[in-house]
Amino acid sequence: MTLLEKIKQNKSLSKKDMQSFIVTLFDSNIETNVKVELLKAYTNKDMGQYELTYLVEYFIQTNYPNQPFYNKAMCVCGTGGDQSNSFNISTTVAFVVASAGVPVIKHGNKSITSHSGSTDVLHEMNIKTNKMNEVEQQLNLKGLAFISATDSYPMMKKLQSIRKSIATPTIFNLIGPLINPFKLTYQVMGVYEASQLENIAQTLKDLGRKRAILIHGANGMDEATLSGENIIYEVSSERALKKYSLKAEEVGLAYANNDTLIGGSPQTNKQIALNILSGTDHSSKRDVVLLNAGIALYVAEQVESIKHGVERAKYLIDTGMAMKQYLKMGG
């Protein structure tokens, strides 16, 4: 039975199968249509937790056998792929969280399945992404670093045209946030695919995160949203996985539909972010940033609850600290 047949028949894959899957995707001698069919088939397969951890560890260990570490560093990002066309929520959140003194290493990419990826909006903001050898100094000076996935993992460039041709989320949407080149202490990760939450949570535990939260937003978004019950998986190195749901109203924020969070081009999304960070926007767009920043501040042990995290995020914006962080970055 070929690898493609095994995948199409939803078989569990061995370590050898996983190696073959990766080698095939990155082999320049194999035709693109073969890779597209293989990646499509794997994306439709019920992926085992072992398979996810194998893929993540393969990319990290192949590229960073001595993975760098920065004390108490956090990443806040989503998988993308939720087709919501929301503005760049997690990028905006990164400025708020960093303004609280949490070292943030945000690992992002250009748009694959949306109008504006994190590096697209950063380019509009005139904020450069950092090379790997610049990150530690950047964190020491500014407390916030942005890394482009195609810089930290150049091999990923080979897959960009294939992923764009598929035009729907693939396994690499799930892998991207998990392969931050730095060994993180804390992580908040939004996930568009609810069925993978438990697998990803266990993989984060395998990667040694001290604390992390996974979010499947109400109505399918890869961020915590204001439109109903957000599914939360809380990861801790000290206890078992904890699953619960969270509504915006429980932390003092108003209900709002997901379509009120729609963004647009990188230029539009830059302006939305600036309006929020400067304190001039008091719409649901601000509230969704407060919610996600509140979750991140809770994970980073800055506050004792998500509700307190939301209050802290309000303070950081309303006192100008979040905007000061943005200006510090050269935006």
Swiss-Prot record:
GO terms for cellular component: cytosol. Disulfide bonds: none annotated. Its cofactor is Mg(2+). Anthranilate 2 binds at R163. It catalyses: N-(5-phospho-beta-D-ribosyl)anthranilate + diphosphate = 5-phospho-alpha-D-ribose 1-diphosphate + anthranilate. NCBIfam families: trpD. Keywords: Amino-acid biosynthesis, Aromatic amino acid biosynthesis, Glycosyltransferase, Magnesium, Metal-binding, Transferase, Tryptophan biosynthesis. One of its GO terms (molecular function) is anthranilate phosphoribosyltransferase activity. One of its GO terms (biological process) is L-tryptophan biosynthetic process. Belongs to the anthranilate phosphoribosyltransferase family. Catalyzes the transfer of the phosphoribosyl group of 5-phosphorylribose-1-pyrophosphate (PRPP) to anthranilate to yield N-(5'-phosphoribosyl)-anthranilate (PRA). This is Anthranilate phosphoribosyltransferase. 5-phospho-alpha-D-ribose 1-diphosphate binds at residues 78, 81-82, 86, 88-91, 106-114, 118. It comes from the Bacteria. Mg(2+) 2 binds at D222, E223. Mg(2+) 1 binds at S90, E223.
